[in-house]
Amino acid sequence: MISAGDLRKGTTFELDGQVYTVIDFLHVKPGKGAAFVRTKLRNVISGGVTETTFNPTAKLQEAVIERKEMQYLYSDGELYYFMDQETFEQIPLNFEQVENAIKFLKENMFAIIKFYKGAAFSVEAPNFVELQIVECEPGIKGNTATNAMKPAKLETGAVVNVPLFVNEGETIRVDTRTGDYMERV
């Protein structure tokens, strides 16, 4: 059992016979009255999103989630194909299942696929990835004095903010959990 006060992004639990993953949460402590936890939940099976409020002391049944590392192979435009490294079985996933991770995944990279009762429902990119910048404004000499940022498009299509001194064609390390630039490689 998990307490509603312990809910965090990515926590998966069962509620009313359905399995939900926390997308967003907020602990609210009003000046008058009892505290509560406001959550935005995604149904693991249907993909539907709902907002629910919990008492922080409410107990929820934690769902048993299997995590498996798989290799991202390719996309045919609609589906994204991942391969199990042990059985070489390929599984297709739709955009809703991969939307958070796919912007940081190149072909042949490894990712964590989450399964509930044998059905894949979510993809987690590695915490840090190294990607090349394919489009950004050129850096100008002397732009290292401030911590100003500029948008840069990566080879996967993701757009991240990078310091002014980073140029097109360079490879950078990105934190996939936040989408933030970490360093040049």
UniProtKB/Swiss-Prot annotation:
Keywords: Cytoplasm, Elongation factor, Protein biosynthesis. Signal peptide: none annotated. HAMAP family: EF_P. This is Elongation factor P. InterPro entries: Elong-fact-P_C, NA-bd_OB-fold, Rib_uL2_dom2, Transl_elong_fac_P/YeiP, Transl_elong_KOW-like, Transl_elong_P/YeiP_cen, Transl_elong_P/YeiP_CS, Transl_elongation_fac_P. Its main location: cytoplasm. The keyword Protein transport does not apply. Involved in peptide bond synthesis. Stimulates efficient translation and peptide-bond synthesis on native or reconstituted 70S ribosomes in vitro. Probably functions indirectly by altering the affinity of the ribosome for aminoacyl-tRNA, thus increasing their reactivity as acceptors for peptidyl transferase. It is found in: Cytoplasm. Pfam families: EFP (PF01132), EFP_N (PF08207), Elong-fact-P_C (PF09285). Transmembrane segments: none annotated. PANTHER family: ELONGATION FACTOR P, ELONGATION FACTOR P (EF-P) FAMILY PROTEIN. Coiled coil: none annotated. It comes from the Bacteria. Belongs to the elongation factor P family. GO terms for cellular component: cytoplasm. GO terms for molecular function: translation elongation factor activity. One of its GO terms (biological process) is peptide biosynthetic process. CDD domains: S1_EF-P_repeat_1, S1_EF-P_repeat_2. Pathway: Protein biosynthesis; polypeptide chain elongation.
